């Protein structure tokens, strides 16, 4: 997917790009100096494992991890925490009862947030804050031209981008931040086809 977005999508024309999957989990693909970077034993890009907080949803087996805050599974966990807190204090959540708690999904919360529900919006705001914190580290360490984010971020960009960018502007090294753009993935449902093409092209380069 990283190769596809680099060769054909939102990262086309760059030499240094980071691609983040923001779906069931969180992972990254790194293009550095015009080449796919995989690390010493192919473990480069496991950004989801980074701990951003001592508390929070669990992702990659670690509480408060980047994946815990910035993935579908993590947002679902975060939602359960926020909703349970409301229910335990006797408050009603129109879109989720105690019996429905285990069925909560990131998509459901996004739908409610889009309708203007303040609780649902606060859940995505928390995710966006920690996304900004995580990306600030990426910008400081790798100094990329572009960070491309797929999945949930692409579908909820309007809700998440302003909060995420505010955190990046506060946290990231200003000289590195100035030259880095954060973009939603461009290839959408076609990314699988483009990925196959880009892998084949990369093997012949």
Regions inferred by a protein language model and the residue ranges of each:
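Conserved beta-strand segments that form the floor/walls of ligand-binding pockets within enzyme
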Residues: 21, 31, 51, 148
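Short beta-strand scaffold segments in enzyme catalytic cores
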Residues: 3, 26-31
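Glycine/small-residue-rich loop that forms an oxyanion/phosphate-binding "nest" at active or ligand-binding sites
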Residues: 1-5, 20
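A short, polar/charged loop-to-alpha-helix boundary motif
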Residues: 43-56
């Amino acid at each position: 997917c990283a190769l596809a977005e680099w060769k054909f999508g939102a990262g086309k024309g760059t030499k240094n790009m980071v691609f983040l999957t923001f779906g069931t989990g969180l992972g990254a693909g790194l293009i550095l100096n015009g080449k796919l970077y995989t690390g010493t034993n192919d473990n480069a890009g496991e950004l989801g494992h980074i701990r951003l907080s001592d508390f929070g949803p669990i992702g990659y087996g670690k509480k408060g991890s980047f994946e815990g805050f910035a993935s579908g599974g993590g947002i679902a966990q975060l939602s359960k925490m926020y909703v349970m807190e409301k229910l335990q204090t006797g408050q009603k959540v129109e879109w989720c009862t105690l019996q429905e708690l285990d069925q909560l999904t990131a998509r459901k919360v996004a739908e409610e947030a889009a309708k203007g529900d303040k609780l649902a919006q606060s859940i995505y705001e928390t995710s966006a804050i920690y996304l900004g914190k995580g990306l600030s580290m990426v910008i400081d360490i790798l100094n990329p031209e572009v960070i491309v984010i797929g999945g949930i971020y692409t579908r909820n960009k309007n809700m998440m981008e302003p909060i995420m960018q505010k955190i990046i502007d506060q946290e990231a090294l200003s000289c590195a931040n100035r030259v880095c753009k954060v973009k939603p993935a461009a290839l959408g449902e076609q990314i699988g086809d483009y990925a196959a093409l880009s892998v084949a092209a990369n093997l012949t380069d």
